[in-house]
C-alpha cells in the first residue's frame, strides 16, 4: 500500500485589511484581483470573526488555536519572552517531519529574531518599515533596499520553489496594509513619521478616488 502523503500548509495573513475592502466583498473601487481569485476558486467564510481583533493577540490565536485569555497575549505590549513559549502549531509540525517557515510580520514582542519551531525565519522588528526595511533572516539582521511587500514575496517564493523530500508549512504574514508606525514597549504608537506608502508602480492606482474617513479612524 502506498504511503499516504502529508499535506502542505500555506497561511497568508494580511495586516489591517477589513473584509469589506476587497473587490470580492463588494467594495466599489478597491482592486484586489489576486485575493478575489482565491475567493472565487476556494471558499469564503462570510460569518467569520475574531474574538480579539488586535495585532498581537490575533496572531497568537491563529498560531495556537487558543483564546487570548488562555495564551496570555492580550494586547500589543512587547512580550518577546512570552512569544518564545507559545504552543505554536509549527513546533508540532516540525516534530512530525515538516519543514517550517515564518516569513513576514511576527509582532508578538518588538524583536525580529527567530522564534522556536521554524527552519526558515524572515521577519523584522515591531511593525517594520515599508521602504528599505530591516530584515532578520535566520538571525542575521540588516537593512535591505526595496519595498517590503516585494522583498517578503521574494523570500516566500524561494521557499515554496525549494526542492524538498518532506512536506512544508509556511506562515506568510505581510506587513501590508499596515502603515509605518513606531510602537513603544508599552504598546503606545507614534504615527509622526508614519503613514502608508504604496509601491511606486501603484502610486496612481487610485488617482482621483475619494477615500472617506471613517468615524473611528485615528
Regions found by a protein language model. Give the residues of each.
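Active-site-proximal cap/lid insertion segments
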Residues: 3-7, 16-29, 125-144, 160-166, ...
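Active-site segment of extracytoplasmic enzymes that catalyze sulfate/phosphate-ester chemistry
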Residues: 11-12, 19-102, 112, 116, ...
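Amphipathic alpha-helical segments in well-structured domains
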Residues: 31-32, 86, 115-118, 149, ...
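The substrate-binding groove and active-site-proximal loops of carbohydrate-active enzymes
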Residues: 73-80, 140-148
Amino acid at each position: 500500500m502506498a504511503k499516504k502523503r502529508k499535506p502542505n500548509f500555506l497561511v497568508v495573513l494580511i495586516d489591517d485589511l477589513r473584509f469589506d475592502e476587497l473587490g470580492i466583498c463588494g467594495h466599489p473601487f478597491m482592486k484586489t484581483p489576486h485575493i478575489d481569485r482565491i475567493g472565487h476558486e476556494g471558499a469564503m467564510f462570510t460569518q467569520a470573526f475574531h474574538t480579539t481583533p488586535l495585532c498581537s493577540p490575533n496572531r497568537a490565536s491563529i498560531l495556537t488555536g487558543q483564546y487570548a485569555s488562555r495564551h496570555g497575549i492580550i494586547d500589543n505590549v512587547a512580550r518577546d519572552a512570552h512569544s518564545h513559549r507559545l504552543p505554536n502549531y509549527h513546533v508540532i509540525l516540525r516534530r512530525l517531519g515538516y519543514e517550517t517557515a515564518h516569513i513576514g510580520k511576527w509582532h508578538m514582542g518588538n524583536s525580529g529574531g527567530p522564534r522556536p519551531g521554524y527552519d526558515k525565519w524572515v521577519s523584522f522588528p515591531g511593525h517594520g518599515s515599508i521602504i528599505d526595511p530591516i530584515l532578520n533572516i535566520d538571525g542575521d539582521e540588516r537593512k535591505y533596499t526595496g519595498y517590503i511587500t516585494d522583498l517578503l514575496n521574494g523570500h516566500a517564493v524561494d521557499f515554496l520553489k525549494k526542492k524538498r523530500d518532506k512536506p512544508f508549512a509556511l506562515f506568510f504574514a505581510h506587513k501590508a496594509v499596515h502603515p509605518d508606525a513606531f510602537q513603544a514597549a508599552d504598546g503606545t504608537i507614534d504615527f509622526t513619521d508614519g503613514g502608508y506608502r504604496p509601491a511606486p508602480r501603484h502610486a496612481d492606482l487610485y488617482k482621483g478616488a475619494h477615500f472617506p474617513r471613517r468615524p473611528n479612524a485615528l
